[in-house]
């Protein structure tokens, strides 16, 4: 039946070019499709030299602030920065001390789930995929909102801040439900401490003993910041544009975006990177043998192994040609954590694949621009070191 449906439902691929139909958010030449305008973030991938645009190291700006400067300032002050960057993205300016204090207090106020929500919604229907679990929880929160359908700016802002506050609990509690009911592990549900940052809340809820190191929390905080915003043209954000244009409610729009984010070509890529490397480790005898690694990467591209999709996950980007600035920042942090946690050999393997993959892709595929590792590449290793490998952050 499936073959009959396929044979009677195919469209000649040449017609897409003939009528200039976009089949996704990327053109045939690999460039991203313009889907809208934003002043929340700015991406720079080219610079003018002698009147011509030439590729350059990528730059990312949040509301006019270079993300390198944002992260650098946070590291210099040895503080957590996720909450203040949320404020920046929402309101367009950096908060002063009083504004940040009030905003953090608001996040803490909303950091609670309805009574019996964990038992009735999260634990009763565990899912092997955390994005599926979170999306279902978000949709169900509609039923606990006294004013769910109001799409005024004030109400949508309130709903979004509440969702930002509870996402750590939705994800970690969903993970615990999966571990308990589908993997026969012990079940434990911790409450979020009001004095903790978002990164600390995630790690505290995740661990049986609630313990984590300052380095773990700071690196996770950095990862959260680097994944927050990227030009407004990605798949899940585009999904939000489409769905909200119908006038639907906040919970439905966010659930739709999460459904998009679940896909392995979008937000699910960091989980795919983790599993791809687990597969590589099983089949590569010598992690320092470039030739053996390159041969196996060719097999991945030729759909002979791993998930047979022909993709080296974590490589390439729709916009960046030379480098992804988020990846550069994250790589340095992951290297520090890998050294502290005893993952030096794993990190070295990631570096080798990062170096060899562009060569293999260039030999096997027709490419229109440079191929470099993106922010998902090292995040897979990071989340596995933090025991977050199955949780989409």
Label the predicted regions:
Residues 1-391:
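Non-transmembrane, aqueous-exposed alpha-helical and coiled segments at domain scale
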């Amino acid at each position: 039946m499936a073959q009959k449906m396929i044979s009677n439902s195919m469209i000649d691929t040449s017609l897409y070019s003939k009528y200039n139909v976009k089949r996704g958010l990327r053109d045939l030449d690999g460039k991203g499709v313009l889907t809208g305008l934003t002043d929340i973030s700015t991406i720079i991938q080219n610079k003018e030299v002698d009147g011509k645009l030439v590729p350059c190291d990528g730059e990312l700006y949040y509301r006019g602030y270079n993300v390198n400067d944002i992260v650098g300032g946070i590291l210099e002050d040895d503080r957590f920065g996720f909450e203040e960057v949320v404020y920046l993205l929402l309101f367009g300016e950096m908060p002063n001390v009083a504004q940040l204090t009030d905003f953090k207090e608001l996040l803490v106020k909303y950091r609670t789930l309805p009574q019996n929500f964990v038992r009735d919604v999260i634990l009763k229907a565990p899912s092997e995929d955390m994005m599926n679990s979170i999306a279902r929880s978000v949709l169900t929160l509609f039923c606990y909102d006294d004013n769910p359908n109001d799409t005024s700016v004030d109400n949508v802002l309130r709903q979004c801040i509440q969702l930002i506050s509870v996402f750590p609990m939705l994800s970690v509690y969903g993970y615990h439900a999966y571990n308990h009911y589908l993997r026969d592990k012990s079940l434990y549900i911790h409450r979020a401490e009001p004095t903790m940052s978002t990164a600390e809340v995630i790690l505290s809820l995740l661990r049986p003993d609630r313990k984590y190191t300052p380095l773990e929390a700071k690196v996770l905080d950095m990862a959260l910041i680097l994944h927050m915003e990227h030009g407004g043209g990605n798949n899940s954000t585009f999904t939000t544009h489409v769905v909200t244009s119908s006038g639907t409610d906040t919970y439905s729009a966010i659930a739709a975006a999460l459904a998009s984010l679940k896909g392995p070509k979008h937000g699910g890529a960091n989980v795919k990177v983790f599993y791809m490397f687990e597969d590589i480790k099983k089949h590569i005898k010598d992690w320092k043998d470039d030739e053996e690694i390159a041969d196996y990467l060719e097999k991945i591209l030729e759909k002979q192994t791993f998930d047979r999709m022909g993709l080296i996950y974590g490589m390439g980007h729709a916009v960046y040609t030379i480098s992804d600035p988020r990846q550069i920042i994250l790589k340095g942090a992951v290297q520090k954590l890998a050294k502290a946690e005893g993952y030096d050999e794993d990190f070295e393997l990631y570096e080798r694949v990062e170096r060899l993959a562009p060569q293999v892709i260039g030999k096997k595929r027709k490419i229109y621009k440079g191929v470099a590792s993106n922010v998902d590449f090292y995040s897979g290793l990071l989340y596995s070191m933090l025991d977050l490998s199955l949780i989409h952050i």
